[in-house]
Amino acid sequence: TAKGVGNFFHRTWQQAVKGKNNLLPIFVAWFDIDIYSIPIDNHEEFIHSMDEYEWDLWKLGATLEAIAWYREKKKDMKDIWRMNSEYPSTPTEAFQSTGRRRFRLSDTLKLRETCIDPIFHGEISGSEETGVESLQNLRLSKEEIGCLSIWKMPDKSKRYRNRYIVVMDVGGVSDEADYTDITVFDRYWMMDGGIPEVVAEWHGHIDHDKGAWKAVQMATFYADEEDAMVVIESNTLETEGTEGNNFEYILDEIAGHYSNLYCRTPADQIRQGAPAKWGFHTNTSTKPMVISHQAKAIRDSLYIERCEEAVDEHDTFEIKEDGKTMGAVEGMHDDRLMTRAIGVWICYRIGLPFAVNTPIATPTRKVISEATI
């Protein structure tokens, strides 16, 4: 039985289903195997006793005798997820990897329905890799192995304040380290009661300073600074003993050139002289908060996902054995998931986008903090 999503076998299966490799996808459900059935004495009585999942099995093609066998076999299994994994009815059940998953399988299946191939794959660059010069002469270059994926290009036909949110989850530089992920959300449809959608993502390994400026590059590519907020997850940067030592200086430098940078220091405290603490701090309080909101968001379809790999990370995110902490299953990552959890949470906590009909003067420093949200 195949177990786990996001691994080689799962990726190969997905590519085969999409016709992107030379393999023919064939799935054999448990009810396609004749030995998995038992006789039924009273068919009418059995039909009236069937639950919702058993009716789903019937719709998938299982006979009543097969469903009767499944009902009896399930009594031998400690957890329903083990039954689904050992005797899968669908490919999704076959790839299920854990019974401690944080997000419901039915919800992630729904989230996966809006995933599509990007219209662009490559890289974004400016005159320099860091500093204010990195925001000048921005250009895209197509590359097969590039880190940037775009599902929707910027719409600059008209300005909309608060339209875009760019979220960065900081990773490491080495191949073994976590990835840095930068996700762009477009909130345009929220003006009319709609929902935000993922429109671009940069995913790879990069130095922290270059990665931070890369996030600002993407924000600048999509909108003027008053129209795109940059949110950098700062926990990694503040707790690491190596690569993150100088990141406070880097964020201060960015703030000097880009005004719409998320700050968790209350604005009134800054006015009184308190130092600005840039970035979203993920800790034992805020992580459960944004993860709980993300669970609600995918359950209630509160945002549009485009990236299959991001859904994979939802499928491999679990509650650990202590029953308190959460994270990716061993060998997997959650960087894409965290940009979604933070980004969607912020999408619903700042003011709605609105059209800007007249030219705007040079913006003054605007502090966006947890207090203002």
Question: Where are the predicted features?
Answer:
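RNase H-like, metal-dependent nuclease domains and their acidic two-metal-ion catalytic environment used
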Residues: 1-9, 18-22, 38-40, 44-266, ...
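Surface-exposed intrinsically disordered loops and tails
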Residues: 269-276
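Conserved AAA+ ATPase "SRH/arginine-finger" region at the nucleotide-binding site
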Residues: 26-32
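Active-site-adjacent substrate-recognition loops and nearby beta-strands
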Residues: 12
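Amphipathic alpha-helical blocks and their helix-capping loop/short-beta junctions
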Residues: 277-284
